[in-house]
């Protein structure tokens, strides 16, 4: 039996993510013009035809580089040659608030959500690969992240699906060559200014050279294990929250919980009280934890979103 080609391996991965969809459904695929998203678009187009699903390729032009409009038009032309009849270019404005990468990502997802709503798309496909996952885990380790962050990117979250987390970047490049798609190499992906690029170009190759091959595989396996653990811990914390008042939490009840559960309960309660999603760090939570486990009469803790946490009469009070 002949070895499966890179494109066929991508098609198999996409097929698994289409298994719960129905004929006539609309799906989006975000395409940057790079090898990963272009290969995903090719695999999705082939599999969508088999299931009579309507794929729309979406090119987000962040307008952050002088030739971004040209890149978007060239990408649209390549997708048209590959067989796409529905391609949308969305030019967006990135307001930088917390770093260029994070701000661009937030603006990109907002645009994708808007297009998904306007087209009634049931899923949005993203081209993150095994290499991206390994880089994410290593960056999380370097930053001292917790279980959830170290679990990397989810295969599915809300409408978003990442079928290529088991596929390598070399496979996506080979798949593009296989189908004749000319892909774009984003100069930002070669700039050592970015930590992710330094991990990709220096750290991972050094680990492979000094420790041995298979580092990306090992990191992605660890991410999957950690995601399963994080899901279980989150579920436990949700069950605790269902039994208590998240605005007035009993100190003895909180103190009796394992720290991993207590920290999740406190974090979730703070978000329920109005802290912006994703705004809490370990530095924010440590003084709140101390109100429970190292009480010395300290005052209230001020948190993002104007949330305040204080210990009052044996309770952790949020306002």
What are these regions (language model features)?
Residues 1-202:
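Core alpha/beta nucleotide-donor-binding catalytic domains of modification enzymes
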Residues 2-36, 56, 60, 91-94, ...:
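AMP-forming adenylation/ATP pyrophosphatase catalytic core
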Residues 99, 191-194, 214, 221, ...:
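A structural signal for alpha-helical segments
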Residues 186-190, 213-216, 278-279:
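Short, surface-exposed loop/turn segments at secondary-structure junctions
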Residues 206-218:
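Inter-helical turn/loop segments and adjacent helix faces that build the functional surface
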């Amino acid at each position: 039996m002949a070895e499966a080609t890179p494109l066929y391996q991508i098609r198999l991965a996409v097929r698994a993510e289409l298994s719960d969809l129905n004929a006539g459904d609309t799906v989006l695929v975000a395409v940057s013009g790079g090898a990963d998203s272009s290969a995903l678009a090719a695999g999705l187009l082939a599999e969508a035809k088999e299931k009579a699903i309507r794929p729309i390729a979406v090119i987000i032009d962040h307008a952050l580089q002088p030739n971004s409009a040209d890149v978007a038009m060239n990408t649209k032309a390549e997708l048209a040659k590959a067989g796409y009849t529905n391609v949308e270019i969305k030019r967006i404005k990135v307001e930088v608030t917390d770093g260029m990468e994070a701000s661009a990502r937030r603006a990109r997802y907002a645009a994708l959500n808007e297009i998904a709503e306007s087209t009634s798309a049931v899923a949005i496909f993203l081209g993150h690969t095994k290499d991206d996952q390994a880089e994410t885990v290593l960056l999380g380790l370097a930053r001292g992240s917790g279980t959830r962050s170290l679990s990397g990117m989810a295969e599915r979250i809300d409408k978003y699906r990442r079928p290529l987390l088991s596929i390598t970047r070399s496979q996506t490049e080979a798949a593009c060559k296989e189908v004749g798609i000319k892909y774009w190499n984003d100069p930002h992906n070669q700039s050592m200014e970015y930590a992710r690029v330094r991990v990709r170009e220096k750290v991972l190759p050094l680990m492979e050279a000094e420790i041995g091959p298979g580092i990306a595989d090992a990191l992605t396996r660890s991410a999957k294990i950690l995601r399963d653990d994080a899901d279980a811990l989150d579920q436990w914390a949700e069950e605790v929250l269902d039994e208590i008042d998240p605005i007035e939490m009993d100190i003895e009840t909180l103190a009796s919980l394992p720290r991993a559960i207590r920290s999740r309960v406190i974090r979730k309660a703070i978000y329920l009280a109005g802290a912006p999603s994703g705004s809490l760090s370990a530095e924010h939570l440590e003084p709140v934890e101390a109100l429970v486990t190292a009480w010395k009469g300290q005052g209230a803790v001020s948190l993002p979103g104007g949330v305040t946490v204080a210990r009052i009469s044996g309770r952790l009070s949020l306002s």
